[in-house]
């Protein structure tokens, strides 16, 4: 731990020496302290929040999300029409838009980007660790260029969240000519149409974006956006308090009261759509018994975790969907309150009164992972009180993600939905259609849930969709494929000189509207 802390502080010192930020950031540059180095800047290959927070400033999709909400607004498509049968979407693209390399944005460029992910015979085929487009939009029949500024996408079947998914970063549009020029190096040479463009990337030190003065939506007020990886929470806290950075997140929760009193910073908070849970391997010879999984839920003191570790920056999870999902959130499901006697009774009934041993996979840090090691230690102690020995195995985030999809006994995870549709949480994580390499890492399967979630995807009428997801939640919570822990609040800390910043429910850091005093 000490070595990692010193390494994180060394990175911060190196950043300050390079940028001159030790006293304060440049007057017209905004400095953001991220939790980790971005992994890639190629939209189809992004699986982490740190990469997404940067690349969303560089690239855009056909549709966008309104600032501060999941409401859809025009993006690179200025309008669209949907056929009566719900299978054909016709997009009218914005005229006179160019990529950062000067090449034109048009329908052929959009088709190229879709084709790259849908056609595994393409010489440029790439999806990264997780094939987002095939999972999100696997029922695409064709992507056709009608004319330079008109694109038509035909579906094999209706997909209710289709437009929502077009706002996901994996479907952002990039320069085909840049990809052809740089090939695999495109992961560090992003060329989009967005309000910022890449100026420099010094691995382990900083990523520098400069504003796109020719941006179709109007140039940002901030001249530069500088992102520095600061792995340790204490180092991020020190940097925001001294003014070395302008904005950060995931500082130690016990520091928030003092930060709220600091006249130089703003602590912005809101509930989120995120879920923090422990995936249980339902194929494990012991965990395949629902009674055991229920017992583990009763054995974990979630209220204590939120009170003592997270300092109130979360709410107890009832199930997979947070209250942010509004009518889709099923309030009647049980919370699995902390109840050791009930946990012991269930284990005895299942034949495991003497306890058993499991491997518990835990990341050292990562996108939205709150305080993973501290939380794991408490959960380990909770489980020990009912005879379950959870052997913690910690890994750095990149190695952890790979291991997570290799059927560990139990593993921590946080899911921060990029879109506001329940499909992105429930179908992606809990349908048997989404076994690894997709993200149903516990191999949970329930025929009734599968049927409800598939119907939810293809039912366009929202009033008809709501009861499908609410019923699915009841079954899922009863089955307990996860230890449902919490829905973390979004907490962003920024300096008072930052004006116009607004929280986004998917944890994005939108800077287009920001200005600096």
PLM ranges: what are they?
Residues 92, 111, 129-177:
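Surface-exposed binding/hinge segments that line
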Residues 33-84, 115, 122, 189-192:
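N-terminal lobe/hinge region of extracytoplasmic solute-binding protein
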Residues 32, 203, 348-419, 462:
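Ligand/substrate-recognition segments at binding pockets and active sites
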Residues 25, 78-123, 152, 239, ...:
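Aromatic- and charge-enriched surface segment that lines or borders ligand/interaction sites
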Residues 316-349, 367-374:
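Structural transition elements
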Residues 385-401, 406, 427-495, 517:
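Extracytoplasmic/peripheral linker and loop segments enriched in polar/acidic and small residues
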Residues 212-258, 389:
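Ligand-site clamp/hinge motif
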């Amino acid at each position: 731990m000490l070595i990692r802390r010193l390494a994180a502080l060394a990175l911060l010192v190196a950043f300050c020496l390079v940028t001159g930020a030790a006293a304060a950031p440049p007057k017209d540059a905004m400095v953001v302290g991220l939790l980790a180095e971005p992994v890639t800047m190629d939209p189809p290959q992004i699986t982490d929040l740190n990469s997404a927070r940067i690349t969303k400033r560089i690239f855009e999709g056909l549709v966008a999300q309104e600032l501060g909400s999941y409401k859809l607004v025009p993006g690179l498509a200025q309008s669209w029409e949907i056929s009566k049968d719900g299978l054909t979407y016709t997009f009218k693209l914005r005229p006179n838009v160019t990529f950062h390399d000067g090449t034109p944005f048009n329908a052929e460029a959009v088709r190229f980007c879709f084709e790259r992910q849908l056609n595994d015979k393409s010489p440029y085929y790439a999806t990264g660790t997780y094939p987002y487009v095939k999972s999100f939009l696997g029922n695409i029949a064709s992507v056709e260029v009608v004319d330079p500024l008109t694109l038509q996408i035909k579906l094999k079947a209706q997909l209710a969240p289709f437009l929502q998914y077009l706002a996901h970063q994996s479907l952002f549009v990039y320069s085909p000519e840049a990809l052809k020029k740089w090939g695999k190096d495109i992961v560090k040479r992003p060329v989009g149409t967005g309000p910022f463009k890449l100026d420099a990337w010094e691995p382990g030190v900083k990523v520098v974006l400069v504003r796109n003065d020719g941006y179709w939506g109007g140039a940002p007020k901030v001249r530069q956006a500088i992102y520095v990886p600061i792995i340790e929470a204490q180092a991020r806290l020190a940097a925001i308090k001294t003014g070395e950075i302008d904005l950060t997140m995931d500082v130690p929760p016990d520091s928030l009261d003092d930060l709220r009193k600091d006249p130089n910073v703003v602590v912005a908070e809101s509930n989120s759509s995120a879920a923090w849970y422990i995936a249980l391997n339902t194929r494990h010879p012991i965990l395949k018994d629902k009674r055991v999984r229920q017992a583990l839920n009763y054995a974990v003191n979630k209220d204590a975790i939120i009170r003592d570790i997270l300092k109130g920056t979360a709410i107890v999870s009832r199930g997979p969907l947070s209250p942010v999902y509004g009518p889709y959130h099923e309030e009647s499901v049980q919370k699995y309150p902390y109840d050791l006697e009930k946990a012991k009774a269930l284990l005895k009934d299942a034949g495991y009164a003497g306890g058993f041993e499991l491997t518990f996979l835990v990341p050292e840090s990562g996108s939205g992972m709150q305080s993973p090691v501290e939380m794991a230690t408490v959960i380990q102690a909770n489980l020990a009180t009912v005879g379950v020995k959870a052997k913690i195995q910690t890994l750095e985030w990149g190695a952890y993600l790979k291991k997570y999809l290799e059927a560990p006994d139990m593993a921590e995870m946080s899911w921060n939905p990029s879109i506001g549709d329940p499909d992105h949480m429930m179908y992606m994580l809990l349908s048997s259609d989404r076994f690894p390499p997709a993200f149903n890492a516990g191999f949970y399967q329930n025929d009734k849930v599968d049927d409800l979630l598939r119907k939810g995807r293809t039912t366009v009428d929202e009033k008809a969709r709501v009861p499908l997801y609410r019923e699915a939640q009841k079954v899922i919570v009863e089955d307990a494929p996860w230890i449902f822990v919490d829905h973390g609040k979004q907490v962003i800390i920024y300096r008072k000189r930052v004006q116009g910043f607004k929280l986004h429910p998917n944890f994005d850091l939108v800077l287009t509207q920001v200005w600096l005093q």
